[in-house]
């Protein structure tokens, strides 16, 4: 899978002529403002958040460059995937977890001001992270998480197909270049983006670690069977399956994406990466407690922590991608900017990998760091908790929990990390 680099470069060059004073499109913010079309329904599918499948509208906010005439009639699309641990914000015990998060909104706006169209999409939630049943708790945690990831990949693919369908039959309302679709995943969204790019064979989800050893019929989990039941859920693209487990959306259109960026997150297994997969960039805290930077186990942060499944993080993923030649399109570009120089000083020669080293967590060195590009407000978190039926103290707890792995959190600090993301990622997409 390879993006149309020549076409993107030519389009970017024409745009640059229109904005010579301001800078080069995609590399700098050449548009003064952003137009947001909120809550566009891109698909409908069954969510199991309450335990009973419910058909739900899945929505996205679409960010477009504005404030100046746009000479491009077909613009690259970024599908943005927010964080949240597959549990709704506040319910998940944190101050983040929706497409309205400060970091998600800011990153989408910055991409749009550079000339991309950005779809900031919701996806289906729901798993059982805290099940501690001594007999089958591990299988329930692992199985329900894998099903959550699987459903979210189906949702992201439905979103991609929505835009290709719109371009084909609806006069391309958002002026999308159907040959240039990119995924950018933050935190949990990083899991979605990475696994979207590599999962394509049923055999990949029947590895021994993805087979249940116990029965949990309430969850559709049975000993000796894969956690993911494709006969019920449909295939990786969300095609097939049965109600009330899957609802097909926009069949017949391509799911192809041309580039993948993960800000944290992980991949289910290194064997899933193959030659020809989309180019990948990984930006990852080296001491991330939620998604290992290298090879490790995903844990639920309870007391004591509950193991879920072993995965690989950006440190291993980008190494494999480079070894297979998937990042050849930018691997030898010879970037000499300060962001590249910093990344290259600590990434063991793995171009496209930016390890984030922040020193010891001052609250507790064992906690590590996660999401330094995020910021949140105590009062807003309290108000959101109240709006969801909780006491304000629930907001206090969520705010405090988020600070544990982002102890120096503030807007200026977060924006500095977002600046790093933009200046590392965009030259590699455009090259």
Predicted features and spans:
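Short beta-strand element of the alpha/beta-hydrolase
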Residues: 73-86
């Amino acid at each position: 899978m390879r993006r149309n680099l020549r076409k993107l470069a030519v389009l970017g060059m024409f745009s640059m002529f229109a904005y010579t004073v301001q800078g080069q499109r995609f590399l700098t913010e050449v548009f003064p403002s952003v137009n947001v079309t909120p809550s566009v329904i891109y698909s409908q599918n069954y969510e199991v958040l309450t335990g009973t499948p419910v058909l739900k509208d899945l929505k996205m906010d679409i960010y477009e460059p504005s404030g100046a005439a746009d000479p491009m009639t077909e613009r690259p699309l970024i599908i943005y995937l927010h964080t949240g641990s597959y549990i709704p914000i506040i319910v998940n015990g944190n101050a983040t977890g929706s497409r309205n998060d400060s970091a998600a909104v800011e990153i989408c706006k910055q991409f749009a001001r550079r000339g991309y169209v950005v779809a900031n999409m919701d996806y289906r939630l729901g798993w059982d992270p805290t099940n501690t049943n001594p007999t089958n708790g591990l299988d329930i945690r692992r199985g329900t998480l894998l099903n959550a990831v699987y459903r979210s990949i189906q949702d992201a693919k439905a979103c991609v197909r929505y835009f290709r369908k719109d371009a084909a039959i609806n006069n391309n309302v958002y002026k999308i270049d159907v040959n240039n679709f990119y995924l950018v995943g933050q935190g949990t969204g990083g899991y979605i983006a990475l696994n979207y790019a590599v999962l394509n064979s049923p055999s990949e989800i029947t590895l021994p670690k993805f087979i249940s050893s116990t029965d949990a019929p309430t969850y559709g989990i049975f000993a000796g069977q894969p956690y993911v039941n494709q006969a019920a859920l449909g295939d990786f693209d969300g095609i097939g399956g049965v109600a009330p487990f899957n609802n097909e959306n926009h069949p017949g259109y391509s799911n192809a994406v041309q580039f993948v960026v993960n800000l944290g997150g992980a991949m289910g297994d290194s064997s899933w990466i193959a030659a020809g997969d989309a180019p990948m960039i990984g930006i990852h805290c080296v001491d991330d407690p939620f998604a290992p930077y290298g090879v490790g186990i995903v844990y639920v942060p309870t007391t004591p922590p509950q193991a879920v499944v072993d995965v690989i993080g950006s440190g291993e993923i980008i190494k494999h991608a480079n070894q297979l030649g998937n990042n050849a399109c930018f691997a030898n570009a010879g970037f000499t900017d300060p962001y590249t120089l910093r990344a290259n000083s600590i990434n063991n020669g793995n171009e496209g990998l930016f390890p984030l080293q922040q020193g010891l967590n001052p609250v507790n060195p064992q906690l590590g760091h996660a999401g330094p590009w995020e910021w949140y407000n105590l009062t807003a978190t309290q108000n959101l908790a109240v709006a969801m039926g909780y006491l304000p103290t629930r907001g206090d707890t969520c705010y405090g929990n988020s600070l544990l792995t982002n102890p120096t959190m503030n807007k200026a600090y977060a924006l500095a990390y977002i600046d790093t993301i933009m200046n590392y990622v965009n030259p590699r997409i455009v090259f």
